[in-house]
A protein has these predicted regions:
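Conserved catalytic cysteine-centered active-site region
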Residues: 38-59, 86-140
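Glycine-rich phosphate-binding loops at beta-strand->alpha-helix junctions
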Residues: 85-91, 248-260
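Phosphate/pyrophosphate-binding loops at sites that engage ATP/ADP/AMP, CoA/4′-phosphopantetheine
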Residues: 64-80, 232-249
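Flexible, glycine-rich active-site loops centered on histidine and acidic residues
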Residues: 133-166
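Condensing-enzyme catalytic core mediating Claisen C-C bond formation in acyl metabolism
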Residues: 4-53, 156-228, 232-236
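Acidic, glycine-rich active-site loops and adjacent beta-strand->loop/helix elements
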Residues: 16-17, 85-90, 116-121, 144-149, ...
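Buried hydrophobic positions in well-ordered alpha/beta secondary-structure cores of metabolic enzymes
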Residues: 11-13, 39, 68, 82, ...
Length: 261
C-alpha cells in the first residue's frame, strides 16, 4: 500500500533470554592480570552470561522471540517478518533469522539478518519501521542476539571481560497514529556509520581469512567516539520527532560501559 504518514510501528510485545552460565569478574583473576575492582571501576560490569555447548545465537534469539510472542499473545505465523541483528550468526549462511523462523515453526513471511554490531538492534528496528510504514509488513519481530564469547581473545584483558551472550526481542505492529509526538510507537530514527574508523573495533577473521577471528579494540578511542556520537544522534532523533530533552523520561543506550553512559 502507499505510505501513510500517520501510521506508526508500535511495540506490542517484548522478551529476552540469557544463558544459564554466569561468570563473575573474579573468575578472570585466575587466567588474567585483572581483578573484580579493576573491571567494575573501568566498565561497571559485575558479571556476564555465556552460552553453553549446544547453544547458538539462533537458539538464544528463538528463546527471546518465544517470550515476546507470549507477551504479545501471538503465534509465530502471526508475524510477517523477522529481522535479527547479530554479528555472530551461527553460520556464514543461511541467516540466523531463518533458523529462528524454523525453530519457531513459522511457515510464512520472510527473515533476514542485519549486521551493524553495537548499533545493530537500532538498525533492525529502523528496518522494521520502514517495512511497516511502506505497507510491506504488518507485524515484525526484531531481535538482537549475540554469542560474543565465541570471538573473544581470552588473553586480552582489555576486551574479554566486557562482552557476554544473550538475546532480546520486540514485536512491532502497524497502528494508526496522529503523526504527532503524542503517538505511541517509533517517532523518529537517526542512523549513522563511518567506515573510516574500522581499526578502532573489528574482528580479525572472516570469509576472506578462512578463520572466525577474534575481537580487537582500541578502547580509549572507541570511548571518545561513543560519547560524542551518542549525544549527537540522540539530539538529531529528538529534533526529528519534535521533542526536547526535557520531554524524555528514559534513555536506553548501548550498555557497553557505565562510563560511556
Amino acid at each position: 500500500g502507499e505510505t501513510n504518514m500517520s501510521k506508526r510501528a508500535v511495540v506490542i510485545g517484548c522478551g529476552h533470554y540469557l544463558p544459564k552460565r554466569v561468570v563473575e569478574n573474579a573468575e578472570f583473576e585466575a587466567t588474567l592480570d585483572t581483578n573484580d575492582a579493576w573491571i567494575r571501576t573501568r566498565s561497571g560490569i559485575e558479571r556476564r552470561h555465556f552460552a553453553e555447548d549446544g547453544e547458538t545465537t539462533s537458539t538464544l534469539a528463538t528463546a527471546a522471540a518465544k517470550a515476546a510472542l507470549d507477551d504479545a499473545g501471538l503465534e509465530a505465523d502471526d508475524i510477517d517478518a523477522i529481522i535479527l541483528a547479530t554479528s555472530t550468526a551461527d553460520l556464514t549462511f543461511p541467516s540466523a533469522a531463518t533458523m529462528v523462523q524454523a525453530q519457531l515453526g513459522m511457515t510464512r513471511g520472510f527473515a533476514y539478518d542485519v549486521q551493524a554490531v553495537c548499533a545493530g538492534f537500532v538498525f533492525a528496528l529502523s528496518n522494521a519501521n520502514a517495512l511497516i510504514l511502506s505497507g510491506q509488513a504488518n507485524r515484525v519481530m526484531v531481535i538482537g542476539a549475540e554469542t560474543f564469547s565465541r570471538i573473544m581473545d581470552w588473553t586480552d584483558r582489555s576486551t574479554c571481560v566486557l562482552f557476554g551472550d544473550g538475546a532480546g526481542a520486540v514485536i512491532l505492529e502497524a497502528r494508526d497514529g496522529t503523526g504527532t509526538a503524542d503517538d505511541r510507537g517509533i517517532l523518529s530514527v537517526d542512523l549513522n556509520s563511518d567506515g573510516r574508523h574500522r581499526d578502532l573495533l573489528y574482528v580479525d577473521g572472516g570469509v576472506s581469512t578462512g578463520t572466525t577471528g577474534h575481537l580487537r579494540m582500541e578502547g580509549n578511542q572507541v570511548f571518545r567516539h561513543a560519547v560524542g556520537k551518542l549525544a549527537a544522534t540522540a539530539t538529531t532523533a529528538m529534533t526529528r520527532a519534535g521533542v526536547s530533552a526535557e520531554d524524555v523520561d528514559w534513555i536506553v543506550p548501548h550498555q557497553a560501559n557505565i562510563r560511556i553512559i
